[in-house]
Amino acid sequence: MSPFFMMSLLFGLTFGQTASVCAPSEYTIHVEKRECAYCLAINTTICAGFCMTRDSNGKKLLLKSALSQNVCTYKEMFYQTALIPGCPHHTIPYYSYPVAISCKCGKCNTDYSDCVHEKVRTNYCTKPQKLCNM
């Protein structure tokens, strides 16, 4: 092997993960319930960014567990609860959402993350909007 190839390989293995940019990012969630009069716009932080992954050419030869990709996910988080205004008494007017404190590149945990990217997802209000700053 040539010295250039070896140096490139060592550099890539050593500093490859530093190219990942995964950090808490400000995000607005729009929440509404059919029974409630208002839509609530909640400012929070989510984990967003890019994580280095490696795609194998021999997918048929590997176990499914070896094919999982790293995603930008929560390292530390807590749940905040907001009150949706204008709800009738028989409705539960609370909505809980995650707030990212720190993030990491790792396997997606379906216990607290949506691991599937949906192509069509709306994030807007259809009712009069109230702002919630927590």
Curated annotation (Swiss-Prot):
Native species: Gallus gallus
Similarity remark: Belongs to the glycoprotein hormones subunit beta family.
Leader peptide range in chain numbering: 1-16
GO biological process: G protein-coupled receptor signaling pathway
Gene that this sequence comes from: TSHB
Gene Ontology CC entries for this record: cytoplasm; extracellular space
Name of the protein: Thyrotropin subunit beta
Function of the molecule: Indispensable for the control of thyroid structure and metabolism.
The organism's taxonomic lineage, starting at the top: Eukaryota, Metazoa, Chordata, Craniata, Vertebrata
Pfam families attached to this UniProt entry: Cys_knot
List of glycosylated residues: 43
